[in-house]
Amino acid sequence: NYGYTFGSGTRLTVV
């Protein structure tokens, strides 16, 4: 349950 945004704007969301 946390999110991470890459420099290119791609978003990764994990439980």
Curated annotation (Swiss-Prot):
Record's keyword annotation contains Cell membrane: yes
Cleavable signal peptide: none
Keyword vocabulary terms for this entry: Adaptive immunity, Cell membrane, Immunity, Membrane, Receptor, T cell receptor
Subcellular locations according to the entry: Cell membrane
Chief location: membrane
A GO CC term assigned to this protein in UniProt: T cell receptor complex
GO biological process: adaptive immune response
Function: J region of the variable domain of T cell receptor (TR) beta chain that participates in the antigen recognition. Alpha-beta T cell receptors are antigen specific receptors which are essential to the immune response and are present on the cell surface of T lymphocytes. Recognize peptide-major histocompatibility (MH) (pMH) complexes that are displayed by antigen presenting cells (APC), a prerequisite for efficient T cell adaptive immunity against pathogens.
Subunit description: Alpha-beta TR is a heterodimer composed of an alpha and beta chain; disulfide-linked. The alpha-beta TR is associated with the transmembrane signaling CD3 coreceptor proteins to form the TR-CD3 (TcR or TCR). The assembly of alpha-beta TR heterodimers with CD3 occurs in the endoplasmic reticulum where a single alpha-beta TR heterodimer associates with one CD3D-CD3E heterodimer, one CD3G-CD3E heterodimer and one CD247 homodimer forming a stable octameric structure. CD3D-CD3E and CD3G-CD3E heterodimers preferentially associate with TR alpha and TR beta chains, respectively.
Protein name, UniProt field: T cell receptor beta joining 1-2
